[in-house]
Amino acid sequence: MMKLVLFGIIVILFSLIGSIHGISGNYPLNPYGGYYYCTILGENEYCKKICRIHGVRYGYCYDSACWCETLKDEDVSVWNAVKKHCKNPYL
């Protein structure tokens, strides 16, 4: 009986772990529709700068392209991000 209870607890814990998602994000796109490629993997100023342009505070180089944490789908394109975050009414 004790083994069955322990097994049930383990199954519940693994199901909870599976439902926890990591921090979402996206690869931002440049004005030509391509990725911003990078060579220094991990944190670097280039990717942080690119992510700030897209309206996100933090990003890093992952799989040779800049990855921005918490970047929403509608802000992936640089033009959509600029229109959303810029105060210029002519955009």
From Swiss-Prot:
CDD domains xref list: neurotoxins_LC_scorpion (cd23106)
GO molecular function: potassium channel regulator activity; sodium channel inhibitor activity; toxin activity
Tissue and organ distribution: Expressed by the venom gland.
KW Signal (keyword) present: yes
Signal peptide coordinates: 1-22
Gene Ontology CC terms: extracellular region
GO BP terms, alphabetized: defense response; positive regulation of lipid catabolic process
Any matching Pfam family: Toxin_3
Disulfide bonds listed in the record: C38-C61, C47-C66, C51-C68
SUPFAM superfamilies per the UniProt record, alphabetical: Scorpion toxin-like (SSF57095)
Xref: PROSITE patterns: LCN_CSAB
Limits of the LCN-type CS-alpha/beta domain: 24-87
Cell compartment(s), UniProt: Secreted
Entry keyword set: Disulfide bond, G-protein coupled receptor impairing toxin, Ion channel impairing toxin, Neurotoxin, Potassium channel impairing toxin, Secreted, Signal, Toxin, Voltage-gated potassium channel impairing toxin, Voltage-gated sodium channel impairing toxin
InterPro entries, A to Z: LCN-type_CS_alpha_beta_dom (IPR044062), Scorpion_toxin-like_sf (IPR036574), Scorpion_toxinL/defensin (IPR002061)
Predominant cellular place of this UniProt entry's protein: secreted
Keyword Signal in record: yes
This protein's domain notes: Has the structural arrangement of an alpha-helix connected to antiparallel beta-sheets by disulfide bonds (CS-alpha/beta).
Task performed by this protein: The heterodimer non-edited LVP1 induces lipolysis in rat adipocytes. Induction of lipolysis by LVP1 appears to be mediated through the beta-2 adrenergic receptor pathway (ADRB2). Intracerebroventricular injection is not toxic to mice. The edited BmKBTx-like, similar to beta-toxins, may modulate voltage-gated sodium channels (Nav) and may block voltage-gated potassium channels (Kv).
Family statement drawn from the similarity comment of this UniProt entry: Belongs to the long (3 C-C) scorpion toxin superfamily.
Subunit architecture: Monomer (edited version) and heterodimer (non-edited version) of this alpha chain and a beta chain (AC P84809).
Protein's name in the database: Lipolysis-activating peptide 1-alpha chain
